[in-house]
């Protein structure tokens, strides 16, 4: 009887371990800077994570001046942004409030970039959904 109970406990624990291993790799990058070092870093990380874990879901959330990364007229890295956007598991999202505060329109952003009404809500929601969080800074 004890042996059967022991086997049952091991089976349940093993099931939990399998579930833990199946957790998706999801990370949100918080970019607020127009600094090219920060922008290069986030683009490099997208590439490195995508190579190491092809199924990883990655999102770059931009506000303050970070959204300039996805503005063709202001970004020095626009080709790298477009390359990163070819990965279907990568998304770029910009805070609508930041755009409004800076008199920038969505039409000025690279096609495919999404806007979110409130970036703080986006970040908190992602964390509640168990996304990893990385603040991009140097």
Regions found by a protein language model. Give the residues of each.
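Secreted/extracellular ectodomain signature
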Residues: 21-138
């Amino acid at each position: 009887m004890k042996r059967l109970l022991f086997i049952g406990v091991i089976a349940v624990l093993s099931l939990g371990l399998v579930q833990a291993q199946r957790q998706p790799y999801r990370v949100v990058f918080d970019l607020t800077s127009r600094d090219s070092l920060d922008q290069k870093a986030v683009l490099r990380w997208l590439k490195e994570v995508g190579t190491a874990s092809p199924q990883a879901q990655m999102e770059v959330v931009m506000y303050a001046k970070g959204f300039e990364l996805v503005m063709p007229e202001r970004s020095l890295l626009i080709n790298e942004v477009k390359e990163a956007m070819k990965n279907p598991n990568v998304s770029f999202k910009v805070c609508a409030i930041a755009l409004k505060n800076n008199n920038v329109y969505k039409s000025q952003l690279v096609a495919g970039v999404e806007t979110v009404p409130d970036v703080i809500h986006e970040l908190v929601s992602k964390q509640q959904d168990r996304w990893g969080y990385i603040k991009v800074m140097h």
